[in-house]
Amino acid sequence: MEDVQNSPAQVAMPIDRVGVKNLQLPLVVSDRAQGRQHTVATVDIGVDLPAHFKGTHMSRFVEALENWTEELDYASMKRLLEDVKTRLEARKAYVLFRFPYFIRKKAPATGSPGLVCYQCRLTGELEEGRPSFLLEVEVPVMTVCPCSKAISDEGAHSQRAVVRIAVRMTRFSWLEEFIDLAEVSGSSPVYTLLKREDEKFVTEDAFAHPTFVEDVVRAAAQRLERHPQISWFRVEVESFESIHCHNAFASIERTITPETQPGS
């Protein structure tokens, strides 16, 4: 049969990335408490394409994923990237896994358990044999406005916010490390199941620790700077303001070197 993909391109221009998007697959990820967690991932996968080829071989991306049945970590992701690069005879390979990750959290007063969902992304790229990985996680928190608390006779406005962390690491780290780091940076964590005693605890604890988005992003960034496995990070905090018709945000991005490591 004629291989149209390998025929000459009408416009001889190289393509940076071509492949398939939004392919859903079951996924196994490392879980600090349980060892392993089964979830569902939405996958984007692609390669570069030289100027002289009309098209890529889309079926080979799916074949590579079908043959990849490993637990998601850096080593297994590198093997997947190498397989894709070989199958497509490419110089560069790319894969992105988007998946929900669940942690069963106990309410602070009653201990009632409830699952909290965190949206995660792991991106891998391979070029000239060198892999690079980017881990991202979104963590909901609660914030209480310090200004509102200071100027009001009673109460203060509070709202949910999200801490978005992206890191490049030199070795494996648990997702829970970054989730914990984000949650302690806000006024309070948020929970799925709260009884009245828990609501009282969360409200009083949050009002005892009021935070601007600036406070939250600085606290998270300071903790990320101290992480021994991080070479680069970006953290953004977005607050869904309860008394404004807009959101507030703050972000910090840093490259970590031995010279910039705290205590060096």
From Swiss-Prot:
It catalyses: GTP + H2O = 7,8-dihydroneopterin 3'-triphosphate + formate + H(+). The record marks 145 as: May be catalytically important. Keywords: Hydrolase. It is an enzyme of class 3 (hydrolase). Pathway: Cofactor biosynthesis; 7,8-dihydroneopterin triphosphate biosynthesis; 7,8-dihydroneopterin triphosphate from GTP: step 1/1. Belongs to the GTP cyclohydrolase IV family. InterPro entries: GTP_cyclohydrolase_FolE2 (IPR022838), GTP_cyclohydrolase_FolE2/MptA (IPR003801). Converts GTP to 7,8-dihydroneopterin triphosphate. The keyword Transferase does not apply. Its EC number is 3.5.4.16. One of its GO terms (molecular function) is GTP cyclohydrolase I activity. One of its GO terms (biological process) is tetrahydrofolate biosynthetic process. It comes from Nitratidesulfovibrio vulgaris (strain DP4) (Desulfovibrio vulgaris). This is GTP cyclohydrolase FolE2. It comes from the Bacteria. It holds the Pfam family GCHY-1.
